Each structure stands twice: as C-alpha cells, then as structure tokens.
C-alpha cells in the first residue's frame, strides 16, 4: 500500500504513478507557516507579559505583521530549498520535474513544522520567574532567552537536529527516486539545502 505521505517512506510514496501535486506542496508549506506564526505569537505573548518597560503596543496589531513576515520567510525558504535541490541534482546529471522538486522541498518543511510546534509547546517553560526591565526590545529578547532552563535549550537543539536529519532523509530518498540520481548525490544536495534553513530563520 502506498503511504499517504513521504514522511516515513519517501521512496515508496514517490514510486506511485501520477504527477506531483502543487496543491499538496502548498498545503504542507502552509502548515510550516502556521507553525511559525503559532510559535512567534506564543513567544511574543509571554515576552510582553514579563517585560515591564516595553513601549505601549498592541500585541494584536503585531501578530498580523508577524504572520506576514513569517509568510515571506517561509516562501523564501521553500524557494531556496527547491532551487538548491533541483539545481544540484541537475548539475549532477539527474532528471525530474521542477514541480516534483517543489513538492519534495515542501515535505521536508513538514518535518521542520513538527519541530516548530514542539518548540512552541515548550515556550511556557522558558518564561523568566522575574520581570524583565530592559527597554530595548533586542535586550529584552536576549534576557528572555538567557533565562530559559538548560534542559529546555537542550531539548530545543535536539528537536532542531532531529528535524534536520528527518528533512534530509525525506529530500534525499525522494530526489533519488524521482530524479534518477544516486542516493549519495541526492544526500549532498539535501545537506546543502538543510544548511540554509537555520541560516534564513536566524536572519529573520
């Protein structure tokens, strides 16, 4: 039986007949966007709650801007990953359609979405026990992060590492199956693509 997603068996999933689905790709990417917005909204809610010197601002007004920024960020990440996967496999002699690469790239983001949801769930446990009195929003964010328990920081890093390995696995075996390329070369392209995810997220 063909699996309904490539999260656990990408080779079998992409061995099915039929064209890739841009609708599926957009849906999975949207889930990643929702995860990002949820995490940032929860993070800012707690940040506003403990920061006593923040300028008066409406959290309800900031969240829509955050959703827009996250939407642009997710779109950029998706396009970058697709470009890297497709470009490198083409240079390495692979075939396969760009449409298929878009779907494959999106499913990797699905793995990251699970990690982001997990990070959102741990945010309440990172809240400082005392109020933060800094006035600069950047300093407030630094203090907020510094107060997080070491165990939570370790869990966050491990979750990101697992999501990255999972995404590389999905991209590698999906590209090898659909683009007529060796697993080794597909893995090289996937690892390069995975490097860009935390880099882009760090910029934003």
State each model region's role:
Residues 27-37, 106-123:
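Hydrophobic alpha-helical membrane-insertion segments
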Residues 199-204:
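Juxtamembrane boundary at the C-terminal end of a transmembrane helix
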Residues 63-86, 113, 120-193:
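Selective recognition of hydrophobic, aromatic-rich stretches within alpha-helical transmembrane segments
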Residues 4, 81-106, 172, 179:
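Membrane-interface segments at transmembrane-helix boundaries
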Residues 17, 21, 54-66, 70, ...:
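Membrane-helix interfacial "entry" motifs
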Residues 41-53, 90-95, 124-135, 179:
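Transmembrane helix-loop junctions in multipass membrane proteins, especially transporters and channels
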């Amino acid at each position: 039986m063909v699996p309904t997603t490539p999260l656990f068996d990408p080779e079998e999933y992409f061995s099915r007949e039929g064209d890739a689905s841009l609708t599926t790709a957009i849906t999975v990417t949207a889930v990643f966007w929702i995860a990002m917005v949820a995490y940032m909204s929860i993070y800012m809610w707690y940040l506003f709650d403990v920061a006593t010197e923040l300028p008066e601002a409406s959290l309800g007004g900031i969240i829509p801007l955050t959703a827009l920024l996250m939407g642009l960020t997710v779109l950029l990440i998706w396009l970058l990953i697709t470009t890297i996967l497709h470009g490198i496999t083409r240079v390495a002699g692979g075939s396969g359609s760009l449409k298929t690469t878009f779907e494959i790239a999106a499913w990797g983001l699905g793995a990251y979405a699970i990690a982001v949801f997990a990070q959102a769930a741990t945010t309440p446990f990172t809240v400082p026990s005392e109020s933060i009195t800094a006035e600069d929003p950047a300093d407030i964010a630094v203090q907020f992060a510094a107060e997080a328990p070491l165990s939570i920081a370790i869990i966050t890093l491990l979750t990101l590492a697992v999501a990255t390995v999972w995404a590389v696995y999905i991209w590698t075996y999906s590209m090898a199956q659909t683009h007529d390329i060796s697993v080794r070369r597909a893995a090289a392209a996937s690892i390069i693509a995975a490097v860009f995810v935390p880099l882009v997220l760090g910029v934003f």
